[in-house]
Amino acid sequence: MFQLKNVTRQFGKKTAVSTVTFDIPQGQMVGIIGRSGAGKSTLLRMINRLVDPSSGSIEFAGLQVSSLKGAALRNWQRDCAMIFQQFNLVPRLDVLTNVLLGRLNHRSTVLSVLNMFSREERIMAIGALERLGIEQTALQPAGTLSGGQQQRVAIARALMQQPKVLLADEPIASLDPLNAKIVMDALRDINERDGITVITNLHTLDTARNYCERVIGMAHGRVVFDGQPKDLTAAAVAAIYGAETAIEESMTSTSINIPAEAPRETASAGLKPLALAGP
């Protein structure tokens, strides 16, 4: 279980995240929504420890994440994989090598420097690409792929870390609706089939409603809503996005529509389960 207690981050005189407190049970899929500048990205970066909290504590399964240093911190960043809006791939390297880079924190320094990957790791990487439906791109330079394909490569690389938690920072913000749906289907498939906790930042209400069992709304660095999608009333939306402008849900839509009567696994059709090898 994740436990955040009074987590705050200040940049000079500006408070980006203010006294955030919540628990997340293992295996939950959580969407964090809010306007740009609400503190969503800073919060995820603190969980991953790319940014340190100014105060407060972050704990995961008894591990004091906010106090980790050295090798223990590197191990946490292995167990807490993160994908970004910008994909963060190495464009000149082929797709397979980019995916294999997810194994670096599982390996010795010498093997990591030499980029020597085992046959088992290569099979695992191909399996991850097959699961995301892009195995045919394995030998292409990553920079030649579309945005949606690059994001799926980033997800495959994250799977190679064998994470306990997957953080997704605006994973569909730069994608068209079709690719946005494919990426969100993949994240939910990982959550449901592997039992991995997924926490994703989203601008869009419809995406949060369709994919997340829990939604956390942020405004001005604070949590102003925490509940199920069905509880996102007009008043809750106004608290998140601001009552000074008449926010309509269509304004924050990516046009990802899943029929209400369809079972959740239908949206993940075509995504194949991946048997992850042991470390």
Curated annotation (Swiss-Prot):
UniProt keyword terms in alphabetical order: ATP-binding, Cell inner membrane, Cell membrane, Membrane, Nucleotide-binding, Phosphonate transport, Plasmid, Translocase, Transport
Reactions catalysed according to its record: phosphonate(out) + ATP + H2O = phosphonate(in) + ADP + phosphate + H(+)
Pfam families in alphabetical order: ABC_tran (PF00005)
One CC-aspect GO term: plasma membrane
Subcellular location field: Cell inner membrane
Signal sequence, start to end: none
Binding site for ATP: 34-41
Residue ranges annotated for the ABC transporter domain, each copy included: 2-245
E.C. number(s) listed in UniProt: 7.3.2.2
Keyword ATP-binding: yes
Broad class of enzyme this protein falls into: translocase
GO-annotated molecular function: ABC-type phosphonate transporter activity; ATP binding; ATP hydrolysis activity
SUPFAM superfamilies: P-loop containing nucleoside triphosphate hydrolases
InterPro entries with a match to the protein in the record: AAA+_ATPase (IPR003593), ABC_transporter-like_ATP-bd (IPR003439), ABC_transporter-like_CS (IPR017871), ABC_transpr_PhnC (IPR012693), MetN_ABC_transporter-like (IPR050086), P-loop_NTPase (IPR027417)
Membrane-topology descriptor: Peripheral membrane protein
Keyword Metal-binding: no
Subunit structure: The complex is composed of two ATP-binding proteins (PhnC), two transmembrane proteins (PhnE) and a solute-binding protein (PhnD).
Purpose of the protein: Part of the ABC transporter complex PhnCDE involved in phosphonates import. Responsible for energy coupling to the transport system.
Protein family per UniProt: Belongs to the ABC transporter superfamily. Phosphonates importer (TC 3.A.1.9.1) family.
Protein name: Phosphonates import ATP-binding protein PhnC
Organism of this sequence: Rhizobium meliloti (strain 1021) (Ensifer meliloti)
Organism lineage string: Bacteria, Pseudomonadati, Pseudomonadota, Alphaproteobacteria, Hyphomicrobiales
